[in-house]
Amino acid sequence: MAVDQLSDIVQRCQTIQDDLYTPEDYDLFQCAARKCIEEGDSVHVLSIIVDEKNKHIVRCMGWNLVGPLVLVLLKNEENSVSPSRAIFSHLLEICSPKELLVSLLEQVEAAEPDVIRDTVMFLLQPLQKVLLNFGRKKATFLGMTLSTLLNQIARLPQEDTAGLGQCCSGLLCFVKPFVEEAKDTRNSGVAHDEELRTEMLKFCMMSLRDPLLGLQFTDPDQQDKSFLCEFATEILAILSGIGESLPELLCHELLKKHEVPGFLEEEVRYPKESLANLAYLLFVHHIAMETFPVVLSPVFILQCNMEHIELLLSRYDLYEKSLVRVEDNSLSVELLEIKTFISVPQNLVKVMTLCPVHRLRSKGLAVFQLSINKFNTEGKYKFLRCMLKTSHHSGVEGVIIKNIKNQVDLSLRPGNKNVWFQGIHFLPLLRLVLSLPQGPETDLLQNLDRIMESLNLLRYLLIRDKESDNETGVWLELQAFNDSFMTPLRLDLNMSKAHYQAELSNAGCDSESVCTVSVGNENLPNLTPEVQIQALHSALFTFELIESVLVRIEEIIEAKP
């Protein structure tokens, strides 16, 4: 019988002096007591545990019973006055805090995903009680505990929002006494107090990364006061409470400190992902925005946010929210010397061209256009030139060339003359626009957007900028443009039309033919003859559209005096 075995081992241990118990004693005590608990004999175990004669035995060995007790309490959902719960509470009072903490954290780490919520919620209060028993030397153990809890909460199934909400709320209650202590002692200059403040900072940074970085709120402009919003609000409040300035954290990359007190290296203390999400919470969801000073200029805030935007580009709401605060035509060209002012739009182009979700591609295009609008004239010139060289996508190149046309149109209006979209500076940009990516062998269908916008720009220049004025310089370079752009384009058009007309004839003669198309080494469904013919007609119509604009340009040139 387990009860008899437990009584025997306890009686034998009572005779041992100075708590010199052997590993075998520990094993026998744990096995017998666990079996009693599992078999429902918790009353007998409780009587042994609370017996004053066994106090030293329980203090040394009792922590081994935490695991079995937690499993029983979670499984059986026993009431608050049950023997098992009484045993658990008594162990928390008399056992070594360090050994209890290890045992409790083992239970947290061992929890399977389907019981993480129940395990975490049950153990938060015992863990808090044990940590408070460490006194002023709790910081390291608190950090270990918070890291374990957050790692387990991150393993919750994504669909378990209720469980995540409970755990986040419970976690805030758990850290409350430690936060208050860190607030009260933040200027004490004592090493233990600084370590506690550092652990609270680590907790906030970890929380900003997970769960807050991996989860979406509701609509940024119409969000409910959800548990996630409340959790984020409290995390930012803790940061402020322990002496971390939110504006300084936001501008951390720009105003990086070289000497940081404490034992953490800077990149560990202030992870980039956490700081990026801090900016996202501030400027997209307006959490704790009332603490942010209004004296900081929108341009400075944008500059601070660019590092964060680069990390969070899939959520380019932060880019948009940072840009809308900036006045149009106000960003100086010097900002383009900062790497992120080029890399962020380049990455945004990837979203615009590669993202499978139409809504996100459209939103990306709108933000890209917004970024163009914010630069001054010289900034627009250099930004558009850089993007035209690096985008390598006809649709994006078409958007860029259309923006160039709009800037030229603006510069030709009375009172808006500038040196960047006229004359000597404009001609190199125009040469870049009026070129075929692969010369006469360029795929006209694949490059349709770029080619049509290039032709529209050239036609506009020839009509709007009279040869007698020649403000843009286009008339001086006309022969060069004819040789490098229009003649190769005409040759390309003739070859493409001949090829597709031949294909159309073949398709009409062989009505039984089936066309197979492969993409990425995978065959797509075969095209029927009717679909083939329709596609060929569509291509020929596109060539006629290109040719009509090209002919109009040639007519304008021929009609010059």
Description of each model-found segment:
Residues 2-8, 17-21, 35-40, 44, ...:
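Alpha-solenoid helical repeat scaffolds
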Residues 66, 120, 345, 397, ...:
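Short runs of predominantly hydrophobic/aromatic residues within well-ordered alpha helices
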